Regions:
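Short polar catalytic/cofactor-binding loops
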Residues: 20-24
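Phosphate/pyrophosphate-binding loops at sites that engage ATP/ADP/AMP, CoA/4′-phosphopantetheine
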Residues: 46-50, 163-178
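Active-site-adjacent loop and "lid" segments of alpha/beta metabolic enzymes
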Residues: 2-6, 10, 27-41, 60-82, ...
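Active-site loop-to-helix "anion-binding N-cap" substructures in soluble metabolic enzymes
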Residues: 45, 50-52, 90, 95, ...
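Structural preference for beta-strand elements that scaffold enzyme active sites
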Residues: 14-18, 51-54, 90-92, 110-111, ...
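Catalytic domains of carbohydrate-active enzymes, especially glycoside hydrolases
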Residues: 40-56, 246
Length: 272
């Protein structure tokens, strides 16, 4: 059975490296869409210090059309086995579909990074059947383009969601050590909603491990004025280090090397 607690015990704060096998992801679409480029990217992520590799075949970025389940599986069936074969660290699959999750686990993936934003019995059964890790993401609005009114307490809303998801998972017979919590920065939230989540990791991290995925996102561009997402890696690394110092257990990033450098500075303060 996969355990986030055991992985963190040996490594401390974890860096999850992003590997998108999509032509349309918001900052790196089309970069890893062949066997050779996938192997090169896996090796790069591992050499740079990734603790987990998160594979996505269906972009949920704003303004992108969600592909069919058939297309998502088609992208994965010839590339995912290559990724698992060449990875010396756990691999997660970024999907909201239980059939895709089951396929990925059959191919050797260890973690489901679930962006659905709702407890689903089919997904829960897949997680239970394979003893997989399960990351819950708070979705905000009905999709990545919408936002709802949190009445000034987005952190409270996210924590309530985490509590509900945790209870349902435990009631279903899934171990607490299999669970991870992602507050969903940039999903169904305004920039004003995203800001307090970054600043309130101390409260949010009462659900552990807390995952923060702020890499290259619009909030980084808003703060820094950097328009091109690919130019936001240094600022993203600073944000990741701040969230870890405030209690985040996992940071999901595009540039692992720069993030590891930032975390090494934080570790000197005795945080990690």
């Amino acid at each position: 059975m996969f355990s986030f607690a055991e992985l963190r015990e040996s490594k401390g704060a974890l860096v999850m490296g992003i590997l998108n096998i999509t032509p349309d992801s918001f900052s790196d679409g089309g970069e890893a869409f062949s066997p050779d480029s996938v192997i090169e990217k896996v090796n790069e992520l591992i050499n740079d210090g990734a603790d987990i590799i998160d594979v996505g075949a269906c972009s949920t970025a704003p303004n992108n059309t969600i592909i069919s389940e058939e297309e998502e599986l088609k992208r994965l069936e010839w590339l995912l086995p290559i990724i698992v074969e060449h990875s010396s660290v756990p691999v997660s699959i970024d999907t909201f579909r239980s059939n895709v999750a089951r396929f990925a686990l059959q191919k050797g993936v260890s973690v489901i990074n679930d962006e659905s934003g709702a407890f689903n019995n089919d997904m829960a059964q897949v997680v239970k059947d394979y003893g997989a890790g399960w990351i819950f993401m708070h979705p905000g609005g009905t999709d990545s383009k919408s936002a709802i009114d949190y009445n000034g307490d987005v952190t409270g809303a996210v924590m309530s969601f985490f509590g509900d998801m945790k209870k349902e998972a435990l009631d279903y017979g899934i171990s607490e050590s299999q669970l991870c919590y992602d507050c969903g920065i940039g999903f169904g939230k305004t920039r004003d909603d995203d800001m307090p989540q970054n600043a309130d990791c101390v409260r949010l991290s009462s659900f552990s491990p807390l995952l923060i995925g702020v890499s290259r996102k619009r909030i980084i561009g808003h703060i820094t004025g950097i328009e091109d997402p690919k130019d936001r890696d240094f600022a993203s690394a600073v944000a990741a280090a701040i969230t870890v110092s405030d209690g985040a257990g996992i940071v999901r990033v595009h540039n692992v090397a720069v993030t590891k450098q930032a975390l090494s500075i934080v570790s000197k303060k005795g945080v990690l």
